[in-house]
From Swiss-Prot:
Organism lineage string: Bacteria, Pseudomonadati, Pseudomonadota, Betaproteobacteria, Rhodocyclales
Enzyme Commission number, as recorded: 3.1.1.22
One GO BP annotation of this record: butyrate metabolic process
Gene Ontology CC annotation, any one: extracellular space
Molecular function GO labels: hydroxybutyrate-dimer hydrolase activity
Metabolic or biological pathway, per its Swiss-Prot or TrEMBL entry: Lipid metabolism; butanoate metabolism
Position of the signal peptide: 1-19
Protein family (similarity comment): Belongs to the D-(-)-3-hydroxybutyrate oligomer hydrolase family.
Keywords: Hydrolase, Secreted, Signal
Major localization listed first in the record, in broad terms: secreted
Protein name: D-(-)-3-hydroxybutyrate oligomer hydrolase
Length: 699
């Protein structure tokens, strides 16, 4: 197919013509060997675009999702995915800063002319492919978006590895937003997670574009197919009907071990497609003109994607990456007791805790801690029924995890245990909402991933399925399956799927509505939570497998002299600063022997889920917390200026913000006064210092 014809039309088409144009030899553009078939989509910036899928700022902000047909097309699913992923990562309310401090702020036409303000639509070209050379059966989806106003004379690439377990559009509203607006190519990776859902009932799977197909017919085109023979699938369903296998949990691949390389592969993909378009054409082939030495490459993203960016910089032996700018990174460090973190009178020794350790600890104690009087009035407390929380407290007391005789006393004991384990006191108001919406699915998904358990093993008697009103597993509704690419986040509960407690008294039930065999009570499945915890604290082959997989994902904090900025909210209850960014700064100072160029910015009144700030069902987020996304964008601005204009980086510091006034659920609109900038010369009392592994953070 003529590549120019593909570029001229606004629908997906194979890029086989481009792939064939590279000639062997030094200096000629060649398709990387790890790439599968490349599919290309060009968008005009009017009916469709790279950043908002044609929805514009108003469409992203609307509470009404875009309509899809009964058999949704790839274009419809892409639009739905961009809509939901954008809204899942940032606060899209005007009062929260969307459309003023961040969001689709500019208009860029197909000729590259920029005007502001606008609806934020950005014309350009999108390239999509599987990375297929991982040594196992799993796949990573990669994508490159090249805006029409990309300047080949001043090329730049920003990475957008997905956060959480999200699919390929998971970073569209974070580093994707900044990079596209800046005119950079954005290199995305789903890092082997995403909405790979294998419906075992119908034996259907998702494809790279989100449409679904029969697993046998899809073959290697499947995003994820469970490792079961036909006989094994049939036998499993006979005992456990209507179950669904999910890629991150059930691929048996420990995908996190590859997240750094996945990010680097996305950058390599970006260099390839940029040179296909902008390289110098000769009779022998296309000569590469956009190269690492003349291209600004910033590794970026947030949460899991931020950790992937840091890992990529550590693993980058080709000098592809020039700098790093990340937010709230989920990063796990190799043990080193030479690291110390001091905040006021609090001193913590060592490099924090692994994700599975602290998440399974939270999974046990958080539903009891919500009964602490100190957590009263927290956003989301209505989602944690007090009677069930009291039952969890009773079970924990029986197992001697906590003390106390009343629910309030036991809640205090559980909250004290969380703070003693490493959570900041500022995260207390987040306990209820995080348990309600985040912690249990993360604990379960990573138990499966680190233990390399298949769907048929039902680790700790858990599985995934759709349910009826009573919580009983039912067939996954066809409409939910068909739109799962656009609505899911890669980690059930999502896309109509729920977590099932297969050991519930009376038969399998939705986890939150199940009855624990050991207590005979509704207590948020304490038996399952204890089992997940035992995979970290206990012995046996499964626990050893989990520990070995965690060892595989731990990093050294050796950034090889690259400049880097980490921004993190002090109140983060999902990826606490004491387990991640603070000790990373200390370990980096040891790894780079005092020659580090890493800066760490901690932000008061900021936490992990900016999208919760504007969520109507979580009143109180808006009057307590400011958007960390403001500082993530600032970090990218500062890094870009440092790399292009040699402006100095600011010192590590604490930024003291001011929450919005008003009543919970009706906060006044945010202004710049609520979110003061990162300072080039912060007050002495706000400096964060690091020396020989010791990090000192202002109180």
């Amino acid at each position: 197919m003529n590549p120019s014809l593909c570029i001229a039309v606004a629908f997906a088409c194979p890029l086989s013509a481009l792939a064939a144009s590279g000639a062997p030899g030094v200096g000629f553009n060649e398709k990387p060997s790890f790439l599968g078939e490349i599919v290309q989509r060009s968008v005009d910036g009017v009916s469709d675009d790279l950043l908002t899928a044609g929805l514009g700022r108003d469409g992203i902000q609307s509470a009404t999702p875009p309509l899809v047909s009964a058999s949704p097309t790839a274009t419809e699913l892409r639009r739905l995915a961009i809509y939901n992923n954008y809204r899942a990562l940032v606060d899209t309310t005007s009062g929260g800063g969307f459309g003023s401090l961040f969001g689709p702020l500019i208009a860029v036409d197909a000729g590259g002319r920029v005007s502001a303000p606008g609806d934020g639509k950005i014309a350009g070209t999108e390239y999509l492919a599987y990375a297929i050379d991982r040594g196992d059966d799993s796949k990573v989806t990669l994508m490159v978006q090249v805006p029409a106003h990309f300047n080949p004379k001043a090329p730049c690439i920003v990475t957008g590895t997905s956060s959480g377990s999200r699919g390929i559009y998971g970073a569209i509203g974070t580093s994707g937003e900044w990079g596209l607006q800046k005119g950079c190519a954005v290199a995305y990776a789903d890092k082997g997670t995403g909405n790979g859902m294998h419906d075992l009932d119908t034996n259907t799977v998702g494809l790279i574009d989100g449409t679904r197909a029969d697993a046998v017919a899809a073959g290697v085109a499947s995003h994820f197919t469970a490792d079961l023979t036909e006989a094994e699938r049939t036998q499993f369903l006979a005992s456990w009907p209507h179950r669904v296998a999910v890629k991150h949990a059930h691929s048996r691949a420990n995908p996190e071990a590859h997240w750094g390389q996945d990010t680097l592969d996305a950058v390599r993909f970006a260099f390839f497609v940029l040179n296909e378009t902008y390289g110098r054409r000769t009779p022998r082939g296309i000569v590469r003109t956009i190269l690492p030495p003349n291209t600004v490459v910033i590794a970026s993203s947030v949460s899991n994607g931020g950790g992937a960016a840091l890992a990529a910089a550590e693993q980058d032996d080709e000098r592809l990456i020039d700098g790093v700018a990340v937010g709230e990174p989920q990063i796990q460090l190799r043990e080193n007791d030479a690291v110390r973190v001091v905040r006021g009178s609090q001193v913590r020794t060592g490099t924090g805790r692994p994700l599975y350790d602290y998440t399974t600890f939270a999974n046990l104690l958080q539903p009891c801690a919500v009964l602490s009087p100190r957590a009263a009035g927290s956003p989301g407390e209505a989602f944690i029924p007090a009677a069930l929380a009291a039952n969890r407290c009773e079970a924990l007391a029986a197992h001697e995890f906590i003390t106390g005789n009343t629910p309030a006393e036991r809640g205090d004991s559980a909250l004290d245990a969380l703070v003693a384990y490493g959570w900041e006191p500022e995260s207390t108001p987040l306990t209820a909402s995080h348990y309600a919406f985040a912690v249990p699915p993360i604990a379960l998904t990573y138990a499966n991933a680190y233990g390399r358990f298949g769907v048929e093993e039902r680790v700790c008697n858990y599985s995934f399925a759709a349910t009826d009103a009573a919580g009983t597993p039912i067939a996954w509704p066809a409409a939910s399956a068909a739109t799962s690419f656009g609505t899911g986040n890669g980690i059930p509960p999502a896309a109509g799927l729920q977590i099932i407690n297969d050991a519930s008294l009376g038969g399998p039930r939705r986890d939150g509505a199940s009855i624990s065999p050991s207590t005979g009570k509704l207590d948020f499945n304490v038996d399952g939570a204890l089992c997940l915890r035992q995979l970290w604290t206990g012995g046996g082959a499964s626990a050893r497998e989990v520990h070995e997989s965690v060892d595989e994902v731990q990093v050294s904090a050796q950034l090889q002299g690259r400049p880097a900025i980490i921004v993190h909210g002090r109140a983060d209850a999902l990826v606490p600063v004491g387990f991640t960014s603070r000790p990373y700064l200390g370990l980096n100072s040891l790894a780079e022997h005092g020659r580090s160029r890493l800066r760490y910015v901690e932000v008061t009144n900021a936490q992990h889920f900016d999208a919760f700030i504007g969520t109507a069902t979580l009143p109180g987020y808006d009057t307590r917390f400011v958007p960390l996304h403001v500082y993530f964008r600032q970090a990218l601005d500062l890094m870009y200026s440092h790399l292009t204009a040699r402006t100095p980086l600011p010192p590590s510091q604490l930024v003291r913000t001011t929450p919005r006034a008003g009543t919970p659920g009706a906060a006044v609109a945010i202004t710049a006064a609520n979110v003061p900038p990162i300072r080039m010369k912060p007050a002495a009392a706000d400096l964060i210092t690091v020396r020989r592994g010791e990090v000192v953070v202002p109180d």
